[in-house]
UniProtKB/Swiss-Prot annotation:
PANTHER family: THROMBOSPONDIN, THROMBOSPONDIN-3. GO terms for molecular function: calcium ion binding; heparin binding. TSP type-3 repeats lie at residues 457-491, 492-527, 528-550, 551-586, 587-609, 610-647, 648-687, 688-723. CDD domains: EGF_CA (cd00054), TSP-3cc (cd16079). One of its GO terms (biological process) is ossification involved in bone maturation. Disulfide bonds join 278-289, 283-300, 303-314, 320-332, 326-341, 344-368, 374-388, 382-397, 400-412, 418-432, 426-442, 444-455, 471-478, 483-503, 519-539, 542-562, 578-598, 601-621, 639-659, 679-699, 715-936. This is Thrombospondin-3. InterPro entries: ConA-like_dom_sf (IPR013320), EGF-like_Ca-bd_dom (IPR001881), EGF-like_dom (IPR000742), EGF_Ca-bd_CS (IPR018097), NOTCH1_EGF-like (IPR049883), Thrombospondin_3-like_rpt (IPR003367), Thrombospondin_3_rpt (IPR017897), Thrombospondin_C (IPR008859). Residues 518-537, 546-699 are annotated as: Disordered.
């Protein structure tokens, strides 16, 4: 065969090697799978491949924001949400999590480390499932063409029954039933094929399988033909002859050598018995000697362990010089034979090592571990209130801890403390608080305002003193209140005249009184109003379209009534399946015309979005089955058997922190050995704690790692809640039928920390969207009118429109003017009620709320102020609520100025095990809820202890 022909054959074989490995390859673009029939067909292909294919690949290109994550691909059962196969990115801890159904029915999870996918950049990830039908499949993760991690010998995948195929669902790019943040460029699943072929699809030069080489070899043999085979056969026979000839020559040489030695012995010594060459032994002591035919007639075995040489002469091996087996700083002593290491150097602990031979010395090196002197129970000998820092082989004593003054020689003494008035930095009208890191802070008492070190009277209890205070830190709460008698915690002043808008009769300074001004906060002397609403053109976000609510969802300055793209997602309202919620991808899994981003039942068709009980779950998928009573139905609860209304899931593994033994998934259990984890919400497997205060370095000042330091964080153990904010709220109307009164009108000020209700309205609620477990909730209540005498208050543990707690206050005794369906009489005084209405909003709940007392199947009166004193016009009151739903603890206190005027005492009720917060009004106008503050708190107060004992004895 000529060379050109041979090169052509080789080229053809190379082409075959590339294509032969991909004969059964199927590529499916998952982003195009939409219709149910198409999804069933794709699911059947995947099911078949799991049973028959050699390998299955998931190839995706996407971009995730830093520390974000979500499900890349999942194959689930619609009926019971069984997770057959799922691959997700856990951005916070830099891994890919693969979960699948095992043959025993349990879910198996595989962590693939070193992913580095959630960093705001575009990555290509290839997940290879090797041998899914084998008893022990494997997983490989390639990130940007490089192998990141792999696992072999995994438990077998459970086969998907054929009957399940029609009920299978494929999900891509999701996080908690919503689209995950970022951008998914492509998502393909490849059934069968080789790594070489898949690498070509992703432009990655992966090596092919051995099967390709075998195919090339087979093809080459078939092309070269019978003549070459015959030639190869002859060459093989020739080679065998050469081997036999070489063996014959070797035997001849041995025989000739024996004859020569015999002749020489006969000539020199005559004919006598042959002398042994091994007696006496010419070999080194302890080395075996063997008689041989070759000169000099003997052969010595190998030198003993620890020695080297030819068997005749053996010298000691210096293991210390050649293997360096001892820890740096520990002396190595060479012996004859062998070596030994002396004790570990000071500051280290370990074992002495000794042995014989280079191999042993290299495999058994001495290990000495650093001694952490700072954890010896004596702070390393440093002052107990100072910082001890461990170093490699030693330690050093540092400065005094936070809250202490001094040095190592004089000792560290408390600088500020809450335990002793002599060391307390707080004002006489302030109370001392311990922060999480041991620092001390001060907070002015109710009726006083300032920075805590300096406090002054605060008549309207809005957090600002009546007179300016000489504070060293220039704290804003030391500035004089611009409305002394009317709460305005935001200190808004549109015309900058030093008088706050809340008490300025001409807030914008345009010469027109507020009651007559159609733009209270914008100067407009001409009072021009082009449309028919009550807002002048100068302050109307739709000057030519009537819109009294002035709603502006996307905050672009253009009201929703005249904005062609209300949510600002780039999709016109008429084409947007979520007109008021940004969703540029327009994902709609249930194909009901309502996008998943705003769908109250994203997996079940409900185009009308009916939600009769206002619990944010559509009626068609609302089961109202809530085993733990935390306001989340079991099918959507990440801890269905433990109350956790906040649904906090720090590691995004689908298991709520309340029932997750390792909240941050760093391998250190939260509470049990080898824990407890000193940073329970932030991954830190090394548990480094430089100052030894029990809090890891990575979460020292920010326990939940939400970029808000703990003293300023209202929920230091939840990265989802940082500040009090009611700007996003849900309006719940409790008497939606009839037109006797109008609905409430809520105005939110001070960045969500102040709410004003302006209308004489039907009963209604403004409910925030943040749900709480244990919570402390406080605020200032003020009725800014003298023309009405009805109900106002606040609510907590809101779960739906028929289940919540409400604290409500009536000014005077009054019988409700509608006696249907029953007569309702309101008594003056503060009341605490548990609403457990079986009917929900309507006339029954309306009259039950008005009535002071129990109403079967509607409202239970838990407590009422025995003074029967109503609120006074234009007077500020401060409430403080403590609620610990895990034990049913409730306590409400009410202050008028600095004086405590009402205290419910400890009340035990477990009707609602957590929920959302909000405010309440019923037929009362001009209510101000100012200086609102909430704080997550699961610590049970000390005054619960007597009730705990009674609960254990079954007496409560």
């Amino acid at each position: 065969m000529e060379k050109p022909e041979l090169w052509g054959v080789l080229a053809l074989l190379l082409l075959c090697s590339y294509t032969c490995g991909s004969q059964d390859l199927q590529v499916i673009d998952l982003l195009t799978v939409g219709e149910s029939r198409q999804m069933v067909a794709v699911a059947e292909k995947i099911r078949t491949a799991l049973l028959t294919a050699g390998d299955i690949y998931l190839l995706s290109t996407f971009r995730l924001p830093p520390k974000q994550g979500g499900v890349l691909f999942g194959l689930y059962s619609r009926q019971d949400n069984t997770r057959w196969l799922e691959a997700s990115v856990v951005g916070k801890i830099n891994k890919v999590l693969v979960r699948y159904q095992r043959e025993d029915g349990k879910v198996h999870a595989v962590n693939l480390q070193q992913a580095g996918l959630a960093d705001g950049r575009t990555h290509t990830a290839l997940l290879r499932l090797r041998g899914p039908s084998r008893p022990s499949p494997g997983l490989q993760l390639y990130v940007d063409c490089k192998l990141g991690d792999q696992h072999a010998g995994l438990p077998a995948l459970a086969p998907i029954p054929p009957a399940e195929v029609s009920g299978l669902e494929i999900r891509t790019g999701q996080k908690a039933y919503l689209r995950m943040q970022g951008f998914v460029e492509s998502m393909k699943i490849i059934l069968g094929g080789s790594m070489a072929r898949v690498g070509a699809l992703s432009e990655c030069p992966f090596q092919g399988d051995d099967s390709i080489h075998n195919a090339v070899t087979s093809a080459l043999q078939s092309i070269l033909g019978e003549q070459t085979k015959a030639l190869v056969t002859q060459l093989t026979l020739f080679n065998q002859i050469l081997v036999e000839l070489r063996d014959d020559i070797r035997d001849q040489v041995k025989e000739m050598s024996l004859i020569r030695n015999t002749i020489m012995e006969c000539q020199v010594c005559g004919f006598h018995e042959q002398r042994s060459h091994c007696s006496p032994s010419p070999c080194f002591r302890g080395v075996d000697c063997m008689e041989v035919y070759e000169y000099p007639g003997y052969r010595c075995g190998p030198c003993p362990p620890g020695l080297q040489g030819n068997g005749t002469h053996c010298d000691d091996i210096n293991e210390c010089a050649h293997a360096d087996p001892c820890f740096p700083g520990s002396s190595c002593i060479n012996t004859m034979p062998g070596f030994h290491c002396e004790a570990c150097p000071p500051g280290y602990k370990g074992t002495r090592v000794s042995g014989v031979g280079i191999d042993y010395a290299r495999a058994s090196k001495q290990v000495c571990n650093d001694i952490d002197e700072c954890n010896d129970g004596n702070n390393g000998g440093c002052d107990p209130n100072s910082i001890c820092t461990n170093t490699v082989g030693s330690f050093k004593c540092g400065p005094c801890r936070l809250g202490f003054l001094g040095n190592q020689s004089q000792g560290c003494v408390p600088a500020r403390t809450c335990h002793s008035p002599a060391h307390s930095p707080c004002h006489i009208h302030a109370h001392c608080l311990f922060e999480r890191n041991g620092a001390v802070s001060c907070q002015c008492n109710v009726g006083w305002a300032g920075n805590g070190n300096v406090c002054g009277p605060d008549t309207d209890i809005d957090g600002y003193p009546d007179q300016a205070l000489p504070c060293m830190d220039n704290n804003k709460h030391c500035k004089q209140d611009n409305c002394l008698l009317t709460p305005n915690s935001g200190q808004e002043d549109a015309d900058n005249d030093g008088v706050g808008d809340q008490c300025d009769d001409d807030a914008d300074g345009d010469g027109i009184k507020n009651v007559e001004d159609n733009c209270r906060l914008f100067p407009n002397k001409d009072q021009q109003n082009s449309d028919t609403d009550s807002f002048g053109d100068a302050c109307d976000n739709c000057p030519n379209v009537p819109n009294n609510d002035q709603k502006d969802t996307d905050g672009n300055g253009e009201g929703d009534a005249c904005d062609n793209d209300v949510d600002g997602d780039g999709i016109p309202n008429g084409l947007d399946n979520c007109p008021k919620v940004p969703n540029p991808l327009q994902t709609d899994r249930d194909e009901d015309g309502v996008g998943d981003a705003c769908d109250s039942c994203p997996e079940m068709s409900n185009p009308t979005q009916t939600d009769a009980d206002s619990d944010l779950v559509g009626d068609v998928c609302d089961t109202n089955e809530d085993s733990d009573g935390d306001g989340h139905q079991d099918t959507k609860d990440n801890c269905p058997q433990l109350p956790n209304s906040s649904q906090l899931d720090s590691d995004n593994d689908g298991l709520g922190d309340e029932c997750d033994g390792d909240d941050d998934n760093d391998g250190v259990p939260d509470y049990i050995p080898p824990g407890p984890d000193n940073c329970r919400l932030v991954p830190n497997p090394n548990q480094k704690d430089s100052d030894g205060n029990g809090v890891g370095d990575v979460c020292e000042d920010d326990f939940d790692n939400d970029a808000v330091v703990d003293p300023l964080d209202v929920c230091p153990e939840s990265a989802e809640v940082t500040l009090t904010d009611f700007r996003a709220y849900q309006t719940v109307i409790l008497d939606p039928e009839g037109d006797a009164q109008i609905d409430p009108n809520w105005v939110v000020l001070n960045q969500g920390m102040e709410i004003v209700q302006t209308m004489n309205s039907d009963p209604g609620l403004a409910v925030g969207y943040t749900a709480f477990n244990g919570v402390d909730f406080e605020g200032t209540f003020h009725v800014n009118t003298v023309t009405d005498d009805d109900y106002a208050g606040f609510l907590f543990s809101y779960q739906d429109s028929g289940r919540f707690y409400v604290v409500m206050w009536k000014q005077t005794e009054q019988t409700y003017w509608q006696a249907t369906p029953f007569r309702a009489v309101a008594q003056p005084g503060l009341q605490l009620k548990a609403v457990t209405s079986i009917s929900g909003p309507g006339e029954h709940l309306r009259n039950a709320l008005w009535h002071t007392g129990h109403t079967p199947d509607q409202v239970r009166l838990l407590w009422t102020d025995p003074r029967n004193v109503g609120w006074r016009d234009k007077t500020s009151y401060r409430w403080r609520l403590l609620h610990r739903p895990q034990v049913g603890y409730i306590r409400v206190k009410l202050y008028e100025g600095p004086q405590l005027v009402a205290d419910s005492g400890v009340i035990i009720d477990t009707s609602m095990r957590g929920g959302r917060l909000g405010v309440f009004c019923f037929s009362q106008e001009n209510i101000i809820w100012s200086n609102l503050q909430y704080r997550c708190n699961d610590t049970v107060p000390e005054d619960f202890e007597p009730f705990r004992r009674q609960l254990l004895q079954g007496r409560v």
